[in-house]
Design a protein with these regions (language model features):
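Glycan-recognition and processing domains
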Residues: 10-58
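Short beta-strands within extracellular/lumenal beta-sheet-rich domains
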Residues: 44-67, 78-81, 101-105, 122-126
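Short tyrosine-centred short linear motifs in exposed loops/low-complexity segments
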Residues: 59, 67-71, 111-113
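Short edge beta-strand/loop segments characteristic of extracellular beta-sandwich folds
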Residues: 72-76
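Short, surface-exposed beta-strand/strand-loop-strand elements in extracellular ectodomains
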Residues: 79-90
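Extracellular carbohydrate recognition and processing domains
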Residues: 89-111
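Short beta-strand-plus-loop segments that form exposed binding edges in beta-rich domains
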Residues: 115-123
Length: 134
């Protein structure tokens, strides 16, 4: 039985997105640390975001998934390196695909708890999780 004083984190189900306007997670399934950036922007699926999360030594995003999902991280339009440490592993160690034209990092994640932290300094605007159908 959960402690009634501790709100439970909603389970991530189906396709989920989380933006970081003001440096705050738009989805309560995600825990964010760090500060906002409003000096950069990102255009994602036709929508321009003017505020995101500084992905520096203080920035991190944590979440849990109960099934295999594809994660896409969307970085600022002028970020040259779209990388992240995923549970301490470098992008090259996770099988992630970085697209520096679209400013994304995409990787398949197994059911687990995840913490995303800085590999190279950047600006994170959105995370999208999509269930993998096998």
């Amino acid at each position: 039985t959960p402690d009634p004083g501790t709100p439970s984190t909603p389970e991530i189900e189906g396709t989920v997105t989380c933006t970081f306007v003001g440096g705050v997670a738009s989805n309560s399934s995600f825990t964010v640390k760090g500060s906002q950036t409003n000096k950069k922007s990102a255009t994602i699926d036709g929508t321009t975001y003017e505020s995101g999360l500084k992905f520096d030594s203080n920035g991190s995003v944590s979440f849990s998934i109960k099934k295999k999902m594809t994660m896409t991280m969307y970085f600022a339009s002028d970020d040259k390196k779209c990388t992240a440490l995923i549970n301490g592993k470098k992008t090259s160690e996770t099988g992630a695909v970085v697209d520096t034209t679209k400013h994304t990092l995409t990787v398949v994640l197994e059911a687990d708890d995840y913490t995303l932290t800085k590999q190279d300094t950047g600006n994170l605007f959105m995370i999208k999780l999509v269930p993998v159908t096998e």
